[in-house]
Curated annotation (Swiss-Prot):
It comes from the Bacteria. Keywords: Cell cycle, Cell division, Cell membrane, Cell shape, Cell wall biogenesis/degradation, Glycosyltransferase, Membrane, Peptidoglycan synthesis, Transferase. GO terms for cellular component: plasma membrane. This is UDP-N-acetylglucosamine--N-acetylmuramyl-(pentapeptide) pyrophosphoryl-undecaprenol N-acetylglucosamine transferase. InterPro entries: GlcNAc_MurG, Glyco_trans_28_C, GlycoTrans_28_N. Gene3D superfamilies: Glycogen Phosphorylase B. The keyword Cell cycle applies. One of its GO terms (molecular function) is undecaprenyldiphospho-muramoylpentapeptide beta-N-acetylglucosaminyltransferase activity. It is a peripheral membrane protein. The gene is murG. It is an enzyme of class 2 (transferase). It is found in: Cell membrane.
Amino acid sequence: MRLMVSGGGTGGHIYPALALIKALKKREPNSAVMYVGSERGLESTIVPAKGIPFQATRIQGFKRSLSLENFKTVYLFLKSVHEAKKMIRQFKPDVVVGTGGYVSGAVVYAAARLHVPTLIHEQNSVVGITNRFLSRYVDRIAYVFDAALDQLPVNKMVKTGNPRAQEAAEVVSHFSWTEYGLQDDVPTLLIFGGSQGALKINAATVAAIPEFNHREYQVVFVTGQKRYDGVMAQLKGTTVADNVVIKPYIGNMPEVLPRVAAIVGRAGATSLAEITADGIPSILIPSPYVTADHQTKNANSLATVGAAEIIKEADLTGETLIAKADQLMTNDALRQDMATASKQLGVPDAADRVLDVVEALKRD
C-alpha cells in the first residue's frame, strides 16, 4: 500500500491521521506513507518528530467576511493544488486520505482531479468547510457521529469512528494513582481543559477546590502548562487537601484515562473518541469558541444516550461544577450506567475500519 495522508491546523485533524498511519504500519509493515501538511501548522513539527515522511505546502483559511485576503487564499489554494499534483505524481499513492483542515482540501482535490482514489474522514457532528467542499469530489466519506449524515452525500458515507479511539482502546495501562500521592481504591475525577488549558474551566475549578477538599472522592486538576503558574497564584492562601492534586499537564494521558472514574472536559472530537473508547462517564463543557458550535453538537451525541452530562460554559461556576461532580462521584450505579453508555458509543477498532475502506478503494 502506498498511502498519502493530509490533515492539519489542529490536533483534531492530525492525531486521527497519525493513528491511521500507525494502524497501517501494523497491518502492512512494508507500506509507504507520505504526509502532506501546511508549512506553519502543528503538523509541520508533530509529524516529522514521529519519523513519518512529510512534505509541506503553503495555504491559509478563508475569512468568514468579504475580504481582500480571500483573493490571496484562493491564489494559495490553486497554487497548493498545483504543488499537490506534483507530489502525487511523484509519490504515486494508491489512495489519498484527508482528515480535515485547509491543507487537506488542496491535496484531496488534486488527487480527485488526477483520478486517484480518495477518502475523507469527518470527526465532528458539524461538517467542516473543507470536507463540505471535498464531499462532492471524493469516493468515500468516513464519519463518526450520525448527525453528519444529513450534511453529506449519504451514498458515499461509511461509519468508522475516529482512528484515535483504537489507539486509546489498545493501551495496556500500568498506571497507579500512587504516583500522584493518591489511592487506587478511591474514585478519581479528572478535570482537563485540553493541552492549553481552558480559562473558564480553570476558574470554576479554583472556586470549587475548598469544596473538593471535603469530598470522599479524589480530584486531579490539569491546568494546562501555560496556565499553571496563574492557577497556583490564584490558590495562594487556599488550602489544597490531600485528595486534590494539581498538575500543569499529564504526559501519559492514554495510560491515565483507564484509571479515571469520570472526566470533566471539552467536547472536541479526539477527546470524545478517547473517552468513549475507554467507557468513561463525562461532564462536558463544550467550547463556545469553535466553528458552528460543533462541540455542543458533539456533546449532545453523548448526552442523549446517557453517556455524559453537559454544562454550558456560560453556566459554569464553582457551584455548578461541584453539583455535577457530586452527582456522578457519589453515585456508583449512575457512573456504571454512564460508563456502559459511553463504551457502547466507542469504536475500539476505528482505525482498522478506516483502513478497510482504504483497501477497498485500492482494489476498486
